[in-house]
C-alpha cells in the first residue's frame, strides 16, 4: 500500500517490528516520501490523534493481542482507520481442514485468527468509532489467486460471485473503514 500512496504524493509514516522493514521500504519508496520507525505495534510511539488516516493491512490476524493492536490504531488516528481481516463467514470456515494444503501451495503460510464483523464493530465502537463500512475483497480464497499469479484471470473468476452478491455475503479478507466520532475524544482505557 505504501508504494501507490507515495506515488500519489502522500508522505507516510511506516512502522515495523524490525529494521529490515525500513530497509525494504527504502528500496521501494522515493526518498523523502516516508519516515520509518521500528517499534512495538502494541505501544506505538506516537501521540494520540497523531495521524488523520491509519492503515494496517495483512497484520491483524497474525497478532496474538489483536484488540491491543486495534486499540493502538484507533488511538493514533484522528479520523480514519483502514485495515483488513479474514472473516469467519467465508471459505475460511474450512481453514483448519485445509491449512496444510494452503501451506503446501504457498510455502510461507502462518496460522491466523478469524474474526466476525460483530467482533470488529464492537472493538471499534469501544474506541469511539462510528459503525464501520465492510468491503469483502474476494469470494475465492486468496491462495487461489496467489497460485494463479494472473490478475486478469483472478478478476474473471471473481466477477460471477460479485455479480450474484456472494462476495458481499461470503467474501474475505474484508477491508474495514472506520471513522472516529468527532465528538468523542480518545479514551485510552487499558494499555
Language-model features: where?
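Class I SAM-dependent methyltransferase SAM/SAH-binding core
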Residues: 1-43
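Short N-terminal helix/helix-N-cap motif within the alpha/beta-hydrolase-1
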Residues: 3, 64-68
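A conserved beta-strand element that flanks and buttresses the S-adenosyl-L-methionine
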Residues: 55
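Short catalytic micro-motifs in class I SAM-dependent methyltransferases
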Residues: 58-59
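A short glycine-rich, Lys/Arg-flanked "PGG" loop and its adjoining helix->strand segment in the class I
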Residues: 67-82
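Conserved class I S-adenosyl-L-methionine
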Residues: 79-107, 111
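Short alpha-helix
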Residues: 109-134
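A C-terminal cap/extension of S-adenosyl-L-methionine-dependent methyltransferases
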Residues: 133-191
Amino acid at each position: 500500500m505504501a508504494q501507490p500512496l507515495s506515488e500519489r504524493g502522500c508522505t507516510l509514516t511506516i512502522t515495523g517490528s524490525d529494521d529490515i522493514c525500513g530497509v525494504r521500504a527504502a528500496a521501494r519508496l522515493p526518498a523523502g516520501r516516508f519516515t520509518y520507525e521500528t517499534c512495538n505495534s502494541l505501544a506505538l510511539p506516537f501521540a494520540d490523534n497523531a495521524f488523520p488516516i491509519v492503515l494496517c493491512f495483512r497484520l491483524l490476524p497474525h497478532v496474538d493481542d489483536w484488540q491491543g493492536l486495534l486499540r493502538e490504531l484507533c488511538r493514533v488516528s484522528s479520523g480514519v482507520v483502514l485495515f483488513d481481516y479474514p472473516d469467519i463467514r467465508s471459505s475460511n470456515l474450512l481453514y483448519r481442514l485445509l491449512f496444510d494444503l494452503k501451506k503446501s501451495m504457498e510455502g510461507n503460510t502462518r496460522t491466523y485468527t478469524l474474526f466476525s464483523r460483530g467482533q470488529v464493530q464492537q472493538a471499534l465502537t469501544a474506541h469511539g468509532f462510528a459503525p464501520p463500512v465492510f468491503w469483502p475483497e474476494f469470494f475465492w480464497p486468496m491462495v487461489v489467486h496467489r497460485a494463479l499469479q494472473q490478475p486478469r484471470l483472478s478478476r474473471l473468476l471473481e466477477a460471477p460471485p460479485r455479480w450474484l452478491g456472494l462476495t458481499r455475503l461470503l467474501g474475505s479478507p474484508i477491508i474495514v473503514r472506520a471513522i472516529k466520532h468527532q465528538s468523542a475524544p480518545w479514551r485510552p482505557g487499558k494499555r
